[in-house]
Every structure is written in C-alpha cells, then in structure tokens.
C-alpha cells in the first residue's frame, strides 16, 4: 500500500536490522524526508510507546507528530496489534496531535517524563479516533 503512494519502506525492528533501520531513518530525516513509525514496536504490547521513537527524535531534533487513523470498512487481522487492512474506497479519518519536541541533552528522569507525556497524548488521540462517528454530518 505504501509503495503505491510513493512512500519508501525502511525495514527493521528491535530484533532484526534495528541499528541499520535506525541509521536509515536518521539519514532520511537529515535529507528532509518525513518518516512514520509504529511507536509500540514490533512485539508490543499494543499501544504502549517504546523508547525508539524518543531516541530518534532526540538524535535528529525532529519532532514527534502523533497521527492516528480509522477507516469505516476494513478487515481486522487476528494479530497481537489487531492490524487493520482498509477496504478500497472506504471512508477514513486522520487525527494529528501537536508536535512533541525532545531535546538532545536531557536527564533520564526528564526522558521518563517525556515518554509518559507522549503515552498520555497517544492514549487521548487513540480514544478520539476510536470514537469518531462516520455517520455524523460534518459542517
């Protein structure tokens, strides 16, 4: 799906090619590209923010911009993260959060606080997108 809309894919996880993927993401950001990652990691647990997204923002200075989406018609996979495959031409909605900046030099305590604030923002936006009503008329 991403290749159809001309988006590059960087493969990697905390178990496989993690360092290589991290370096490729840094280079992409340095080249002015935007990247999207799933912050709960490849192993879960579902919807729990991992350190990778914070380390990437800290290393590059790029902000974390929360993005959540929902489609009306989809197939729900029986996977640990309940992965969704949208049906073609289904209605959808995207909800963006405010950019979150992470300074390059911060204490471990501050990083913990940042991670908690990111998790809280993600939880809030997850509920917002899950409660979106496709039948409600938009003015």
What are these regions (language model features)?
Residues 26-56, 60:
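Catalytic-site beta-strand/loop segments enriched in glycine and acidic/polar residues
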Residues 12, 38, 66-69:
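Generic beta-sheet signal
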Residues 1-24, 60, 76:
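Catalytic core of membrane glycerolipid acyltransferases/transacylases, capturing the structured
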Residues 30, 113-139:
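Membrane-interfacial terminal anchoring regions of lipid-handling membrane enzymes
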Residues 48-108:
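A cross-family acyltransferase "interaction/gating" segment
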Residues 17, 44, 71-72:
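Positions that flank functional sites
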């Amino acid at each position: 799906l991403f290749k159809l809309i001309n988006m590059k894919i960087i493969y990697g996880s905390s178990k496989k090619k993690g360092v290589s993927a991290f370096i490729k993401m840094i280079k992409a950001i340095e080249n002015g590209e935007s990247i999207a990652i799933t912050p709960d990691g490849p192993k879960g647990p579902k919807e729990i923010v991992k350190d990778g997204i914070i380390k990437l923002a800290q290393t590059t200075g790029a902000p974390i911009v929360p993005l959540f989406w929902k489609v009306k018609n989809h197939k729900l996979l029986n996977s640990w993260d309940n992965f969704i495959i949208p049906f073609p031409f289904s209605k959808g909605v995207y909800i963006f959060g405010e950019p979150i900046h992470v300074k390059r030099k911060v204490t471990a305590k501050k990083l913990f606080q940042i991670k908690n604030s990111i998790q809280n923002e993600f939880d809030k936006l997850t509920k917002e997108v899950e409660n979106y009503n496709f039948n409600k008329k938009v003015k």
